[in-house]
């Protein structure tokens, strides 16, 4: 009785990548008092952290004991934009039938599946290809996408993972004279895996299709590919089931004699392409 015991509590910084450590040293004092009537009182004071000072009091004979908490605060974040991280790179083939194609005369964008606004600035065709900006992610962005219904969790092998569906498309406004688009969009997904060391690995999945944009020049009859995208919205925290072949779509003509495809019904693939 009448004694005070003082302790310091500090967190060891192991330097694990992706983690932040709490470097504030907490001081814990325990003061013992005797009221000379047979009751001891222990007053515990915790100080030194950003939460301020917290005091708990316990008297002998009391059944309820309030624990003296010594809180430490840590956080974890990961990104593709760091050594060891991998961003997603989307590259498509661009063809023009009927005349030579000049670099920069066609423009292309990427949008979240079901969205109308381009995710990034439009990119031109160069050398028969379209190279989009790399798609970078971090854990905060993924959390926001999940909350907005644009990403869903697909954890695998004990690692956190997210899947984001996109549509790559050709900007059809301002096409050169005499040019029409036959294959102007395709769907794809990006799977982002948290490696647990502050890095994210983003991988593009084209769902087994060739990433391709096709245009035709000329007034003669041409074949046109009719494509679509199916988006399945799942509630936050739920992983949508595999939708391969689960939805059927039918093409009908509003006018008699209108050109029709050989197959007038089709189903979607795993990435939502129709």
Language model segments and positions:
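Solvent-exposed loop/turn and edge beta-strand elements of beta-rich ligand-binding domains
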Residues: 1-274
């Amino acid at each position: 009785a009448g004694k005070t015991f003082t302790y310091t509590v500090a967190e060891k910084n192991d330097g694990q990548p992706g983690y932040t450590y709490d470097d504030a040293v907490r001081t814990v004092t325990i003061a013992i008092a005797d009221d000379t009537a047979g009751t001891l009182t222990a007053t515990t004071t915790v100080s030194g952290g950003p939460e301020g000072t917290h005091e708990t009091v316990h008297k002998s004979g009391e059944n309820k004991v309030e624990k003296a908490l010594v809180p430490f605060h840590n956080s974890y974040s990961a990104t593709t934009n760091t050594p060891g991280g991998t961003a997603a790179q989307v590259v498509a083939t661009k063809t023009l039938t009927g005349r030579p194609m000049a670099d920069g005369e066609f423009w292309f964008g990427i949008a979240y599946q079901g969205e109308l606004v381009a995710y990034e600035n439009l990119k031109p065709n160069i050398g028969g290809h379209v190279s989009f900006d790399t798609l970078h992610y971090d854990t905060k962005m993924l959390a926001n996408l999940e909350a907005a219904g644009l990403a869903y969790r697909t954890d695998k092998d004990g690692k956190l993972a997210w899947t984001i569906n996109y549509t790559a498309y050709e900007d059809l406004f301002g096409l050169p004279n005499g040019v029409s688009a036959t294959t102007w969009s395709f769907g794809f997904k990006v799977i982002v895996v948290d490696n647990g060391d502050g890095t994210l690995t983003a991988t593009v999945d084209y769902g087994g299709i060739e990433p391709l944009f096709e245009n035709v020049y000329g007034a003669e009859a041409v074949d046109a590919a009719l494509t679509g995208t199916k988006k399945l919205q799942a509630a936050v925290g739920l992983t949508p089931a595999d939708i391969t072949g689960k939805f059927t779509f039918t093409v009908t003509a509003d006018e008699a004699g209108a050109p029709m495809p050989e197959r007038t019904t089709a189903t979607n693939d795993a990435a939502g392409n129709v």
